[in-house]
Curated annotation (Swiss-Prot):
The protein's name in its UniProt record: V-type proton ATPase catalytic subunit A
Species in which this protein is naturally found: Manduca sexta (Tobacco hawkmoth)
Gene behind the chain: VHAA
Pfam families: ATP-synt_ab, ATP-synt_ab_N, ATP-synt_ab_Xtn, ATP-synt_VA_C
Superkingdom per UniProt: Eukaryota
Entry keywords, A to Z: ATP-binding, Hydrogen ion transport, Ion transport, Nucleotide-binding, Translocase, Transport
Top EC class of this enzyme: translocase
Protein EC: 7.1.2.2
């Protein structure tokens, strides 16, 4: 086969045995004959344009292939080239800050190469740039030292934010016979050579790993550190841990993407992998537009957030089959950074589109449909993806721990949480942040319904709170009680009106309103409230709950005396305190700093105590 347009093609090797022939085409599913000897999930190139595909079923010498590109123009009898390897990703310096499609093709490089906003068919560009020089510094590995899978042998400063640690591939071992001196190298240059049983092996900075196979670890550890999101309602009521799994189901327009993006911008993770899977192209372009401008401060240095982020963009107008691959590509990249000892967060937006891709492929294969037409193996596929999260002890030396946290957005049609994808996901994940259409319509964002959401990591995090914020756990319990009580009271209020309630119930209603409007609600697009550090969250809670306790005490202790304290009396006397309570969220953590905010909150607590003492006297 001649090379076309100067692009080198992999079919230059004329091996007739390695060809099969197209037998039938049905959308992204191609059937090929004369394919005996090929393996499940083997990568193939279909047709004269060499479209990337993957074998998903074998019968006799017929293979069913799902193609990750547009199949228009493929005809019966076209050659199918077997590559003999599974669908894999390239791991090495150059991942962060770049944007890939579902099968890890670098979109920026393709755009520069072709000057087109669309990806041409059969384009064959390496995932990581081959001509860039990276500065390699060897670690304490010398010639003659023994090295096994997962050991660190060098560091590349990929950018000023992330140190890219060079790992031995998991299954490698041997005695070092050569290690490159410090200097600039390309990803394909040999930087390490080992010998084992008389066989020499050479390693470059580049590793290739099959996406459907989880990377091995020494052991899984229980998670014990919170994934702080900067969103008050999530950090206080429904915390997630580093290494946890979370689902954000919600109807359209409830703010799933804004929560995912807020997590990517402000969470306490070291690396973010953002997978846009079958969502709008505008959402990915928004990420590309916003992230380079946002900064994060680490060890006193301000850096662009894009330096810790990699994007896997597979928008709704890209081929369906690649949606399935994009989730696996994202999780494999995450596991690679986890193995370096980093805490990684992976956002999948949205897993429903991924399930729909499974449904479409399954329909074309004429498999037996289960609930709502989804394939019977939907639950198993979802589980195999979510179970790759977790906090782990990494392979190799030196000892290090890493974690992968998965946050999956789910968009059930019509916001119905009994949809099969949502139901299957909720059986697997540990944290459920349920978004509510009614709250979103009232413009209460983040629109997380505090009555149906839950987190199963509460107990795992108790030690962390005991050490750092001892007063927090009782405060959280109290908040949940107040919000639950308010829900029960709201029905009575609708029947008989507010005036006929007991005084303590009036206080409960007012404090719940204060909590909802000034604590749970948060404006992602304001400088003071787009990110709320945990000390501010705890301080705000403490003051609001203290106000509740003092009000109830004042009412209950004077109930029998002549000058009764009622809610109206408190409201009239405490106008200033109430105003200060509701303006606590306007304190800007960046401008004011931690010490000033804490001092202000303590001062407010003192003023409040003094005001209540005056009332009761």
């Amino acid at each position: 086969m001649a090379s076309k347009g100067g692009l080198k093609t992999i079919a230059n090797e004329e091996n007739e045995e390695r060809f099969g022939y197209v037998f039938a085409v049905s959308g992204p599913v191609v059937t090929a004959e004369k394919m005996s000897g090929s393996a499940m999930y083997e990568l193939v190139r279909v047709g004269y344009n060499e479209l990337v595909g993957e074998i998903i079923r074998l019968e006799g010498d017929m293979a069913t292939i799902q193609v990750y590109e547009e199949t228009s123009g493929v005809t019966v009898g076209d050659p199918v080239l077997r590559t003999g390897k599974p669908l894999s990703v390239e791991l090495g310096p150059g991942i962060l800050g770049s944007i890939f499609d579902g099968i890890q093709r670098p979109l920026k490089d393709i755009n520069e190469l072709t000057q087109s906003i669309y990806i041409p068919k059969g384009v064959n560009v390496p995932s990581l740039a081959r001509e860039v020089d990276w500065e390699f510094n060897p670690l304490n590995v010398k010639v003659g030292s023994h090295i096994t899978g997962g050991d660190l042998y060098g560091i590349v400063h990929e950018n000023t934010l992330v140190k890219h640690k060079m790992l031995m591939p998991p299954r490698a071992k041997g005695t070092v016979t050569y290690i490159a001196p410090a200097g600039n190298y390309k990803v394909t240059d040999v930087v390490l050579e080992t010998e084992f049983d008389g066989e020499k092996a050479q390693y470059t900075m580049l590793q290739v790993w099959p996406v459907r196979q989880p990377r091995p670890v020494t052991e899984k550890l229980p998670a014990n550190h919170p994934l702080l999101t900067g969103q008050r309602v999530l950090d206080s009521l429904f915390p997630c841990v580093q290494g946890g799994t979370t689902a954000i189901p919600g109807a359209f327009g409830c703010g799933k993407t804004v929560i995912s993006q807020a997590l990517s911008k402000y969470s306490n993770s070291d690396v973010i992998i953002y997978v846009g899977c079958g969502e709008r192209g505008n959402e990915m372009s928004e990420v590309l537009r916003d992230f380079p401008e946002l900064t994060v401060e680490i060890e006193g240095v301000t850096e662009s957030i894009m330096k810790r982020t990699a994007l896997v963009a597979n928008t709704s107008n890209m081929p369906v089959a690649a949606r399935e691959a994009s989730i696996y590509t994202g999780i494999t990249l995450s596991e690679y950074f986890r193995d370096m000892g980093y805490n990684v967060s992976m956002m999948a937006d949205s897993t429903s589109r991924w399930a729909e891709a499974l449904r479409e492929i399954s329909g074309r294969l004429a498999e037996m449909p289960a609930d709502s037409g989804y394939p019977a193996y939907l639950g198993a596929r979802l589980a195999s993806f979510y179970e790759r999260a977790g906090r782990v002890k990494c392979l190799g030396n030196p000892d290090r721990e890493g974690s992968v946290s998965i946050v999956g957005a789910v968009s059930p049609p019509g916001g119905d949480f009994s949809d099969p994808v949502t139901a299957a996901t909720l059986g697997i994940v540990q944290v459920f942040w349920g978004l509510d259409k009614k709250l979103a319509q009232r413009k209460h964002f983040p629109s997380i319904n505090w009555l149906i959401s839950y987190s199963k990591y509460m107990r795992a995090l108790d030690d962390f709170y005991e050490k750092n914020y001892p007063e927090f756990v009782p405060l959280r319990t109290k908040v949940k009680e107040i919000l639950q009580e308010e829900e029960d009271l709201s029905e009575i209020v609708q029947l008989v009106g507010k005036a006929s309630l007991a005084e303590t119930d009036k206080i409960t209603l007012e404090v719940a309103k204060l909590l909802k409007d000034d604590f749970l609600q948060q404006n992602s697009y304001s400088s003071y409230d787009r990110f709320c550090p945990f000390y501010k969250t705890v301080g705000m809670l403490k003051n609001i709950i203290s106000f509740y306790d003092m009000s109830r005490h004042a009412v209950e202790s004077t109930a029998q005396s002549d000058n009764k304290v009622t809610w109206n009396v408190i409201r009239d006397a405490m106008g200033n305190v109430l105003y200060q309570l509701s303006s606590m969220k306007f304190k800007d953590p960046v401008k004011d700093g931690e010490a000033k905010i804490k001092a202000d909150f303590d001062q407010l607590l003192e003023d409040m105590s003094a005001a209540f003492r005056n009332l009761e006297d």
